[in-house]
Amino acid sequence: AAIGGSTLILITTLLLAVVYRKRSSSSKLHLMNSTSSKVEKFLEDYTHQMPTRYSYPELKKITNNFADKLGEGGFGVVYKGKLARGNLVAVKILDQSRHSESQFMNEVATLGTIHHFHLVRLLGYSFEGFRSALLYEYMANGSLEKFIFVEGDVLGWEQLYSIALGAARGIAYLHDECNRRIIHFDIKPHNILLDADFTPKVADFGLAKLWGKGSDHISITATRGTPGYVAPELWSRNLGPVTDKSDVYSFGMLLLEMAGRRRNIDVRASRSSQLYFPEWAFKLIEKGELETRLKERGSTEMGSEDEEKVRRMTKVGLWCIQYNSNDRPSMSRVVQMLEGNGDDVTNPPMPFNSTPSPGSTIAIFYRRLFVDGLTGS
């Protein structure tokens, strides 16, 4: 009887497990079908202004069965491909998650409907059941990131300045010139891509938001962007509304990294005063020592025109990262400041609003966390 009872309990448990698994699978399938229907409805609404749609078998042919992997990011894997007419493309295969669904629709709703010389073109897409992909124009030189954080100044100052100006023009178009204003929310070196001629194009609109022209701010439910490039008001709503000035802040941090040819936070800096580049650069500008100090750490010759470019990039960058968003210029104004036209950029006020200074606070934190931890001291 005891054995019979144990057997009955075991059978009952197994039956319950089977029922649970079926219900769980059914629930998961229902969720995925619901997501699929949502995306298909979205694509239906945008059909009249969409790039080309490809099937999954066509993607396999375009990428030679996904043979040439270009890179991998938070939302999926990117492969090199070739269209039938000979155009090279970058094919991003998105992972299966709610975040990738959101990125897919964001990219299609933004890049799929606009065109600008300094924005990466979305050439096509694929959506079949649980598989989704985006096809972009191929950018032969990859991201700006791999050129500004390396030993030996691969890009000359004139070329670097041209890249900064081109990226600024692309972002200004998003804010002020396209039919529906767009806030990118993830401006950083990794998302500035370079073609074979080093023409810069803003990429990765997975976090972007459309912004009505009649609105003075945008509502978001969570912080967006990459730490180190995120504007203060995105961390705390007490610091004011979220607007296109959040992109201006991110561009300012990018511009400072280009001017310094280093990350804004350098945990290996020989002096704590140099750990946070924006603060160090501000102090050097105040003392009139910026070009001299940057010459000391650069590996290429710097003429007077190069010095002017570095000085202008740094000043504009510091204007862009002002703590109060109202004190930051618009991206259209940033373009004008970089274009110069003989006008000097006025010295920016102190961008930071904290005591102790951000540099000293960051220095203590990062040295304890990284430097001391890595060296064992």
Feature map (PLM): residue ranges:
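Membrane-proximal cytoplasmic juxtamembrane segment of single-pass receptors
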Residues: 1-135, 140-167, 214-221, 226-227, ...
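Intrinsically disordered, low-complexity cytosolic regulatory tails
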Residues: 4-7, 26-41, 89, 272, ...
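Protein kinase catalytic-loop region centered on the HRD/HxD motif
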Residues: 169-182
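Pre-DFG segment of protein kinase catalytic domains
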Residues: 201-204
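Activation segment
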Residues: 207-209
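Conserved catalytic-loop aspartate of Hanks-type protein kinases
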Residues: 247
